[in-house]
């Protein structure tokens, strides 16, 4: 995709966020809207993923540690083709698979369920270490909110010798 196409896609992701949060009459639109460009770039340009085979062994992984921004994550996954965009209107409804925090057992494309802030770093580091130990060729990315503690990154790596794990800070 060229830059203009990515910008248009990010705007569609934003529309999906607003639609989902409005339909649910609850949610955290600010964090989701601010992450739309990052999620769009990762899912449409950078990550090795296949919506038709979301559990493919050599796919890149993504961990949404700040699960309350799930509407942005869901909109990105829907626009990438993991599930129908129309399902965004079911956010937080009884019986919907799109609840307040992502659940890896029920949502196609979700690699890790989200819970308490900060838990995603350990999960992402574990995934990156597993890839290194297995000599696998996938990368792990994480969206993490760090309150009043900015993290210094060196070329996208949090810890030395872990394969391709980066933290996206907002």
Where are the regions that the model predicts?
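Histidine-centered catalytic micro-motifs
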Residues: 29
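Boundary/activation segment at the start of structured domains
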Residues: 163-168
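Hydrophobic/aromatic beta-strand patches that form the interior of the parallel beta-sheet core
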Residues: 141, 169-170
């Amino acid at each position: 995709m060229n830059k203009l196409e990515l910008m248009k896609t990010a705007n569609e992701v934003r529309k999906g966020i607003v639609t989902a949060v409005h339909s649910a009459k609850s949610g955290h639109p600010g964090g989701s809207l601010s992450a739309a460009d990052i999620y769009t770039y990762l899912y449409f340009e950078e990550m090795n993923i296949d919506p038709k085979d979301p559990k493919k062994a050599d796919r890149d992984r993504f961990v949404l540690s700040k699960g309350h921004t799930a509407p942005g994550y869901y909109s990105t996954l829907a626009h990438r083709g993991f599930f129908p965009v129309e399902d965004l209107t079911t956010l937080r409804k009884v019986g919907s698979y799109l609840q307040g925090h992502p659940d890896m057992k029920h949502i196609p494309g979700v690699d890790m369920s989200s819970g308490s802030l900060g838990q995603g770093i350990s999960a992402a580091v574990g995934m990156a270490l597993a890839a290194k130990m297995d000599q696998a060729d996938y990368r792990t990315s994480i969206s993490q909110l760090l309150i009043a503690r900015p993290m210094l990154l060196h070329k996208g790596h949090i810890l030395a010798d872990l394969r391709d794990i980066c933290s996206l800070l907002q």
